């Protein structure tokens, strides 16, 4: 049992060091001296009786204990900010511009309606919503919050899981009447595959797993596009086999307009909110992430238990 609890300001110092990459940069962000930052980290390490950071000529790195402390610190500081907002009623209504990015298909079908509802609840917000057919850089593309259908998130971003999702193989019954349904991934090379080149997808390569192994399959066909909506329409018209997100094809599977192919295989493609700064720093960012999480969970299902907004 600890003799004293870690102070919120010391946890904030740790978070700032991780995000800025150095003690001096963290000090500048906090408006303090490097000596102050060093002292607060020493106090935090003494309080927890463990080393949190390793310093070298190449920079600063978290220890295993430091990584755990950092993750909890993000959660604690976000909860602390909620407490301050609720009790003091200061800035309880988020305001100002927030720039949100997303892919075309999911952006139009889910995020755009969610933003409409968001604005009803928080009319003081201003939202600029931009759709991309490529992976973006939050800084270079000037985006505060990016909604990504991709599990490979760079570690210099913060990511919050909105909901689970996977991509599955589908085709129309009309197509499968003309051509024998593939019985293995290798047989996909004999089929007309509708290739999509969206934000995170490598053109002509499908990464598929069955829970035991993952394989890369090279596919081709007469039709390809950077629009998932167009590829879905081609599949419905019986033009070939496609790999699409479950949220996009589920209504057509239920109606019988599409049939799942090789159902034991799928591609993990969870839906994430991705941003640069911890949520405790920005009420408008926190409100947007929490609202979109609730929106997606209500319509697409909740992710696994145990995650936190950070």
Swiss-Prot record:
A Pfam family this chain is assigned to: HTH_1
DNA-binding interval(s): 23-42
Cited SUPFAM superfamilies: Periplasmic binding protein-like II, Winged helix' DNA-binding domain
Domain HTH lysR-type, residue spans: 6-63
UniProt GO BP: DNA-templated transcription
Keyword RNA-binding: no
Keyword terms, alphabetized: Activator, DNA-binding, Transcription, Transcription regulation
GO molecular function: DNA-binding transcription factor activity; sequence-specific DNA binding
Family: Belongs to the LysR transcriptional regulatory family.
PANTHER family per the UniProt record, alphabetical: HTH-TYPE TRANSCRIPTIONAL ACTIVATOR TTDR-RELATED, HTH-TYPE TRANSCRIPTIONAL REGULATOR
Function field: Positive regulator required for L-tartrate-dependent anaerobic growth on glycerol. Induces expression of the ttdA-ttdB-ygjE operon.
Name this protein carries in UniProt: HTH-type transcriptional activator TtdR
Native organism: Escherichia coli O157:H7
Gene symbol of the encoding locus: ttdR
